[in-house]
């Protein structure tokens, strides 16, 4: 269990000032070189999966970084993979960088589906400031097919790059369409039939993405430190713990054993209901949430189609209670959670390999490490992670007619779990050897466990309620952050704040023009003053979100949010996050003026950054 450190809980008072296009001030320590910078991004990690955020998974290396650095309790992403990466890399809202939705189509400005030329990337800005720049892992900000040259890492400021340009749907294999590129050249071609791929760095070992991307990163660090006085910037973007469920057998077995251990169960509980309660208690003890924080009721979701290539999630019925499940189903879902935990455990081991390398090279204390997730935990494959729920669906698809949402009817049938890919009997613990490397959209832990991963928040990845957009953020820099073990909880921040933070750390300025092109001014603000002083509550700001049909705005403690921003008259929910980050008490009817003001701000934002007109109102280019 993560050691409880001194922490400070609080949320800033209601504020009404907008920060936009903020510049950076140079920051350098006296008689100290500029630090190396490592940004670690993971994929679909829940807010509270890590030990240092109250989770039960063993993450000693990440917990150590938190103990020696600071954690943020109110750090936000954009709710989805590609948009979050675009915001992180550019210091802008995702629409301003060209990726308002995903990378599968071009609907014009704001929705180009690829990184545009109106932004500056972290690679470009830090290379311009004298850093050696490198990226390893998942890129996913280039068009899915025929990406333009200006959207690729080798053309956006990275001296060295080893990436999968698109999504990654396997750990053990490199699937067709998921080729590995090194400096623009394919080095591992995708092949759906390759079941015995080996790690190029360790030919005696099977290929596994987490370990391979770490090997690449270690190689880059090694080369960057040889014969050069330049600091380095490493962007390490893992695909873990995104589905499918794939992890080393020995680590899976470790968690299977724990789930049957009476002492472990006494500390952490058994099943998602009891485990959520115990996790919330740990979060309160750590100072991550308010002492009176409550758990929300959680519901599962299905998708509704807006147009070809664009669908969105909508809530359905409540998730099942653990004690209502038959014992055989409990065993199946515990096994899925064991694999999920093993993926994160393995991630932590690999981050340990990186930090050990930095220590052995004598640069650990003067390297800024940031760790975060691109969105909340995913519930994309049903309640139990089988993709087909109870077997098969008989349903009438939800739809929009004249701006009005018409819910679909869903009726479940069949047996659980079921998937025709394994002889019609489903992906079960008993036949795991047959599907352990199935890859693709094979398996996940399901929405019941995902809700637990997102404790204490509502909803999941894709939504802009807190469960979809709240991410852990760990900042570690012994020579630059002295408030060790503290929690930055009085302010809220966003992915777009990483760019100005790193520029300040590097003593650099944001270029108003790059390669002769005028660039969009920064939207983010530097987090460095708050890393150095977690009590700093001087910042006042307004933030916005929009993804699929989900939208939100936050000003101080007030947050409005909706799952249907296409409605002729949007029904906004309103929450006071000072005492309700779980978003359980909608006070919109009690404070109509707040809703009116914030919704007006959101509409102004939507027009300014090209959220509107929405894609379905445009012609695909």
Language model: regions and residue ranges:
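Formylglycine-dependent sulfatase
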Residues: 2, 7, 11, 16, ...
């Amino acid at each position: 269990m993560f050691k409880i450190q001194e922490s400070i809980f609080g949320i800033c008072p209601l504020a009404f000032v907008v920060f936009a296009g903020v510049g950076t001030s140079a920051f350098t320590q006296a008689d100290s070189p500029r630090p190396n910078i490592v940004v670690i991004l993971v994929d679909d990690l829940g807010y509270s999966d890590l030990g240092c955020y109250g989770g039960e998974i063993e993450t000693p290396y990440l917990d150590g970084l938190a103990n020696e650095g600071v954690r943020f309790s109110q750090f936000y992403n954009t709710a989805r993979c590609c948009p979050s990466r675009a915001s992180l890399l550019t210091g802008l809202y995702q629409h301003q960088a060209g990726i308002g939705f995903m990378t599968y189509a071009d609907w014009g400005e704001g929705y180009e589906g690829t990184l545009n030329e109106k932004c500056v990337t972290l690679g470009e800005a830090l290379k311009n400031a004298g850093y050696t720049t490198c990226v390893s892992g998942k890129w996913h900000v280039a068009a899915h097919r025929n990406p333009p040259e200006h959207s690729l890492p080798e053309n956006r400021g990275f001296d060295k790059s080893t990436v999968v340009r698109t999504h990654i749907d396997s750990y053990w294999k490199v699937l067709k369409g998921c080729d590995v590129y090194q400096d623009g050249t394919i080095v591992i071609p995708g092949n759906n039939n390759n079941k015995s791929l080996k790690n190029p760095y360790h030919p005696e070992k099977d290929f596994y993405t987490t370990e391979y991307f770490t090997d690449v990163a270690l190689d880059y660090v090694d080369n960057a430190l040889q014969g050069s006085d330049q600091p380095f910037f490493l962007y390490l973007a893992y695909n873990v713990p995104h589905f499918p469920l794939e992890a080393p057998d020995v680590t899976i077995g470790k968690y299977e054993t724990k789930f049957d251990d009476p002492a472990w169960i006494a500390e952490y509980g058994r099943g998602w209901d009891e485990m959520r309660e115990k996790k919330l208690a740990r979060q309160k003890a750590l100072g991550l949430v308010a002492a009176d924080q409550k758990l929300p009721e959680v519901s599962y979701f299905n998708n509704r189609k807006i147009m070809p290539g664009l669908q969105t999630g909508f809530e359905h019925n409540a998730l099942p209670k653990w004690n209502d499940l038959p014992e055989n189903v409990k065993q199946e879902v515990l096994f899925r959670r064991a694999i999920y935990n093993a993926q994160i455990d393995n991630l932590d081991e690999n981050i340990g390999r990186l930090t050990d390398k930095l220590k052995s090279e004598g640069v650990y204390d003067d390297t800024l490490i940031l760790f975060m997730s691109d969105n909340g935990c995913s519930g994309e494959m049903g309640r139990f992670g089988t993709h087909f729920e109870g077997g098969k669906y008989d349903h009438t698809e939800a739809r929009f007619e004249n701006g009005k949402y018409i819910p679909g009817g869903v009726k479940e049938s069949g047996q659980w779990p079921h998937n025709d890919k394994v002889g019609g009997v489903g992906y079960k613990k008993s036949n795991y050897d047959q599907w352990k490397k199935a890859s693709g959209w094979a398996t996940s832990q399901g929405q019941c466990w995902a809700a637990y991963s997102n404790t204490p928040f509502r909803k999941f990845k894709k939504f802009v309620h807190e469960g979809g957009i709240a991410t852990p953020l760990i900042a570690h820099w012994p020579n630059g952050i002295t408030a060790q073990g503290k929690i930055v909880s009085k302010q809220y921040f966003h992915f777009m704040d990483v760019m100005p933070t790193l520029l300040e750390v590097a003593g650099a300025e944001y270029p108003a023009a790059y390669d002769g092109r005028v660039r969009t001014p920064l939207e983010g603000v530097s987090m460095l003053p708050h890393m150095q002083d977690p009590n700093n509550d001087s910042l006042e700001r307004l933030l916005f979100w929009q993804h699929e049909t989900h939208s939100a705005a936050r000003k101080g403690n007030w947050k409005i949010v909706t799952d249907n921003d296409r409605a002729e008259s949007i029904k906004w929910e309103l929450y006071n996050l000072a005492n309700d980050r779980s978003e359980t008490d909608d006070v919109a009817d009690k404070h109509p003026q707040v809703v009116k003001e914030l919704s007006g701000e959101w509409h102004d934002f939507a027009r300014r950054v090209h959220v509107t007109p929405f894609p379905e109102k445009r012609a695909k280019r």
